[in-house]
Every structure is written in C-alpha cells, then in structure tokens.
Amino acid sequence: MFKSFLIKYAEIGVKGKNRYLFEDALVQQIKYALRRCEGEFSIRKTKGRIYIDAETDFDYDEAIDNLKTVFGISGICPMIYVEDEGFEKLCGTIVDYMKNLYGEQNMTFKVMARRARKNYPLDTMEINRELGGVILEALPNMKVDVHNPQIELNVEIREKIYIYSETIPGPGGMPVGTGGKAMLLLSGGIDSPVAGYMISKRGVKIDAVYFHAPPYTSERAKQKVIDLARLVSRYSGPIYLHIINFTDIQLAIYEKCPHEELTIIMRRYMMKIAETIANETECLGLITGESIGQVASQTMHSLAATNEVCTLPVYRPCIGMDKQEIVKISEDINTYETSILPYEDCCTIFVAKHPVTKPNLAVIKRHEKNLEDVIDGLMETALNTKETVIVRCDETGNTTM
C-alpha cells in the first residue's frame, strides 16, 4: 500500500545555518541503509523535509527495519501519494486509505492539512472540514476529536498530495559522521559493541582496534569480533577494524611484572597502541566499554591509571550504566547472542586470581620499567604487522571485507 516515507528529525531541526550539512549527512546514511533492501528508492530533501519514494516494488518491513538503524531519524511516516487530479478524487483516495488501515473500528480522528502549494483552491481549514465530513459519511463508526485523537490524518499538498497517519519511532541521535571520528577498543564482550553503538548515536564515526593473542585466542574469537563489528556497522556505517597481534606483549608483561597488576599494565599498553593508530587515522579520541566498578580494572583508581598513558580523550558511553542496562541495549541491537559465544579474548587470559583494584600509579610505572629493554620493539612489531579489514553490511546483510 505504502509507496513513500516522510523522514522526521528532531535535533537537526534546531541547527542554524549549517543545518543543511546535517541533513545531507542524514540523506547519505539513509542511502547506506536502503542499499541493504530490495528495490530502488529516490530520496528528496525539500524545505526542511526528507522524502523517500519507492521507484520499484519493495519489502515494506525490510525498509522500515533498515531505516530504524539510521541515527538522526526521530520518526518514519509511511505515506501514500497521489497526483492532484481534483478534490473529488482526493476524497475518494482518503476514504480508501482510512478503510484499508482502520476498517470499521470505533476510533477518533482529526484531519491535519498542510498547503505547501498556496495556489490550491481550498485553504487549510476548508480541506480539514471537507475531508473530515467525507470520512464521517463513509465511516460512521469514526468520530472527530480535535484535541486528543487516536488517528492524526496528515494531508500535505505539494507537487503531489501526500497522505499519512502513523509515525514509527526512529533511533534519534545525530547522523553518523557529523560528530568527528574516534577509535573503539572492540573486544568480544558485551560492553564494547554497545559503547560503539552509543557513541555512533551522537554522530561519531568509529574505527576499531581488536587485540588478538594467538594461539591463546582462536581464529573463532577473531571471527566473533569481526561479526560484532558487522552488527555494529548496521548503525555506524563501515568500520575499519585494525587487528593487533598482542601475544608477545602479553607474555612479556606476564614474565616481568607482578601478576596482580597484569590487567592494568596490559590495558595501559593497549591504550598506547590504540592511541597510536588513532593519531595515524585522524581520530579525535578513544572509546571503551568500561563501566565504573564492574570489574577490578574498572574501578575509579584503575581507570585513572589507564587514562594516564593517553593524551587523547577517552570516551566511555557505558560508564554510569549497570550490566542489566548494557545487556538490554546489546539485545536491542542484536549483538548479545554473538557477544556471549564462548571464545576467549586476550583480556580473559593470564588473569590474576586477585587483581589490584586500587593501583598505585608510581608503583605501576616502576614495574613497567622491567619491560624497558623489550617493550618498544614489541610495540613496533605489533603496529607494523597489524591487519586492517573494512567491515560493513552489504545488500544481503553479510560481512564484506
């Protein structure tokens, strides 16, 4: 039935003279999402509105599902449109529309006309009144309620006449790419994909780095992270995923540093490597999935020790959330089932039985001096041998690299 969509946005609408930049970015993200759908679509931006018209047959549910992944969209209005062939023809179209959607239900409605074409022979109030009367005559179970109707029937008089009565909630946020770029430390767990999703919602384009530790972590663990990146890319757009072989660095830390400090020291070197790649790729910050107090390495003292090695800001979108809240989002974005697959990542091996929760930074730095003779070479090797893949959802939803 529906041949078109009106795209509503919220935050973009309060922008000033640069609003067109945000609108253009939103159009590009809509195009990216619709490439995953069967059918051809045209997108028009006119007078503060974005319209999507189907040029061929398409799967309605598939289109809605993909549009719901586009940050910046606050609402999706499925529409029909007709050529302006006179008011009598419009009345018949309106009656058919109401019958098809609502049948003989006892419901209240109001008509909300909008004339972008001021030369239309009826004014807004006349359109509202005449169409309301036609609906009442054709559907006697309907009643008018101008204050709190169950149905708001919108009729827009433009070059064509657009009709819609439903607004499907979008994800909100800002279009990806309008908020700069940052580097996500992506593990195989639940939290970091959620962090990537949440920062993308604020318009930030993400790259990602994954620390692989063969043979202690398997190729299945690596593939799991690629799959998580693919799932996040439905929302974020294509992700450059940098895969670092971290094994030799981990072994050196294990051999030369106190075991209760393994996790903190390991994470400090992860942050150093991630920041190096971030600077090379013009990222403006790092992103992690940490939440205060969730594990020993995420106490305030531990986070301060981790931050100390960075000059770039570290963004932690999950910082004030409990695990249940993070899990709920991971379920909503379909990363949860992949995250809980039982493949270990490098953060789960060489774990101390009693990790320090209040690390002393001076002590940590003193113990890191045990690595001075090897660590620079190990880090250089890890960076020089990194593997970079581009992960995206293609038209079939598969991973492409």
Question: Where on the chain are the PLM-derived regions?
Answer:
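Structural beta-sheet core signal
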Residues: L184, A208-Y210, I243, T288, ...
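Conserved G/P- and acidic residue-centered "switch" motifs that form tight phosphate/ATP-binding loops
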Residues: G189
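RNA-binding accessory domains that recognize and position tRNA/RNA substrates
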Residues: M1-M183, P193-I239, E308, V356-L361, ...
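A short alpha-helix-loop-beta-strand transition element characteristic
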Residues: N334-P342
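Active-site adenylate/phosphate-handling loop in enzymes that bind or generate adenylated species
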Residues: G133-I135, G172-G179, Q250-L251, E255-K328, ...
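A conserved beta-strand->alpha-helix junction
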Residues: A229-E255, Y343-D345
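Small/polar glycine-rich anion-binding or flexible loop at a beta-alpha turn
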Residues: I292-Q294, P342-F350
